[in-house]
């Protein structure tokens, strides 16, 4: 008789251990990611039968009978009183595997995330687009959920979210929050945005902008007077602008640049950096607030010059990623070596360090 692997008990254990992600593969013990690092657990190796059973135990009813024949599926699972989990079912070398992201019930307050104070002002904008960007695992989902909840708790608005899948669940507070899941409540992100415009929204949160159809719908929503929040997998403001523009055919890019110049309010690029001193991670953030000069550069396709404004500006609460990393080093939260690992321009950061530590 095959030994039973309790995925429920394992996930409860992982949450208690402070893990952010879990990896389950046939022929390997379970792994957890803690503070950004993968750790092998002391659990025994998982057999195919055990993992098949675990998958069937947590799979949604609608796909339970067929999930083991599929290749890639994303779904949510909840352990009451513990946490929600975003589950990615996939196959590796012909065998099933799970990658799991823990989604806590409680949405952190902005003030508790060690993020720049300007973020709470950015989401007070009545309209336009705000983009939170960064690589996978950089804390984008947590940051943008905190931004949405800041609006929810402080303003009388109607917030519509369009997600795939729904991660954080918002309890309507001062605002009303309507959450819609792609392929469950709406066909696509673009359709969700299009039809949300008929649902009396003030704020539209798009889980991720993946294609030009979604981006076009987001631009239209912003142009028609709504505040649009979303995420992209880009590392800085310049890369974000270029990614958006390059989603479109060359013939349409000038129009898109003009639309973006009129609607983009801010970009927030972030990374999570490890503090060995405190055994936890802190966000390093680049913040770009769109000014009249940046609008002009956007329209004229001079995006590379935008970084110079960020680097040289001491106003408008803007900051580069390197300046943010240097502040964490100066505060003795992280080492120079850790900062350099996360820098988009290590030579510039080294110059900053020489200035910060001059004479010491």
PLM feature segments, named:
Residues 1-360:
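Short, flexible helix-loop junctions that flank or precede catalytic/ligand sites
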């Amino acid at each position: 008789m095959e030994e039973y692997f309790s995925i429920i008990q394992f996930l409860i254990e992982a949450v208690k251990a402070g893990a952010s992600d879990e990896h389950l593969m046939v022929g390997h013990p379970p792994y957890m990611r803690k503070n950004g690092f993968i750790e092998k657990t002391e659990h025994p190796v998982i057999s195919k039968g055990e993992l098949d059973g675990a998958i069937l135990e947590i799979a949604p009813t609608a796909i339970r009978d067929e999930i083991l024949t599929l290749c890639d599926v994303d779904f949510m699972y909840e352990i009451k009183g513990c946490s929600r989990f975003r589950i990615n079912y996939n196959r590796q070398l012909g065998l099933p595997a799970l990658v799991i992201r823990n989604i806590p019930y409680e949405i952190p307050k902005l003030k508790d995330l060690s993020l720049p104070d300007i973020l709470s002002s950015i989401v007070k904008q009545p309209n336009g687009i705000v983009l939170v960007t960064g690589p996978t695992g950089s804390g984008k989902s947590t940051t943008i959920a905190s931004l949405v909840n800041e609006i929810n708790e402080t303003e009388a608005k109607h917030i519509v979210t369009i997600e795939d899948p729904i991660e954080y669940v918002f309890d309507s507070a001062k605002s009303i929050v309507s959450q819609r899941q792609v392929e469950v409540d709406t066909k696509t992100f673009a359709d969700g945005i299009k039809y949300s415009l008929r649902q009396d929204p003030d704020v539209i949160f798009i889980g991720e902008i993946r294609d030009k159809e979604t981006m076009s719908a987001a631009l239209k929503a912003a142009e028609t007077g709504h505040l649009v929040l979303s995420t992209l997998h880009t590392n800085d403001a310049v890369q974000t602008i270029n990614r958006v523009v390059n989603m479109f055919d060359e013939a349409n890019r000038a129009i898109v640049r003009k639309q973006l110049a009129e609607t983009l309010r801010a970009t927030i690029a972030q990374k999570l950096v490890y503090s060995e001193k405190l055994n936890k991670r802190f966000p390093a953030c680049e913040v770009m607030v769109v000014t009249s000069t940046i609008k002009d550069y956007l329209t004229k396709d001079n995006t590379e010059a935008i970084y110079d404004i960020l680097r040289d500006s001491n106003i408008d609460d803007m900051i580069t990623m390197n300046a943010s990393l240097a502040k964490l080093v100066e505060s003795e939260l992280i080492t120079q070596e850790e900062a350099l690992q996360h820098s988009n321009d290590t030579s510039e950061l080294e110059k900053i360090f020489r200035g910060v530590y001059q004479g010491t």
